[in-house]
């Protein structure tokens, strides 16, 4: 959703609006927030990066899960399980958190989630 030039912008916008309309609870991890901040900072600058953080924090629809030591241990197991696939630690923590919360769908375009056995939610 950061950039209208992103190949998935229109679909991401539609999916987020659909999730909000249906009152589907959304959650993410602080590591995904960190990745979002870094990408926005380097692509759009300080103001845009701060605005992105503010919008996420202000959203009543998004819960931020802060990674724990247990999440870290589970993420390491995910990285080992998915080897040799190049999976980021942030994604592995997401897998661990999704697994511990019995969440099998993700609003993402990242095929690493499919490789880990999760479904990409498409609003249906």
Predicted regions and their residues:
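Short, well-structured N-terminal submotif of metal-dependent ribonuclease cores
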Residues: 1-28, 41-55, 124
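Structured helix-beta-strand junction loops
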Residues: 22-23, 59-60, 116
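Short secondary-structure boundary segments
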Residues: 30-31, 91, 110-111
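A general alpha-helix detector
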Residues: 34-36
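Short glycine/serine- and small hydrophobic-enriched flexible loop segments
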Residues: 38-41, 99
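Active-site neighborhoods of divalent-metal-dependent phosphate/nucleic-acid chemistry enzymes
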Residues: 62-105
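Acidic, PIN/NYN-like endoribonuclease modules and their adjacent C-terminal/linker elements
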Residues: 95-96, 100-124
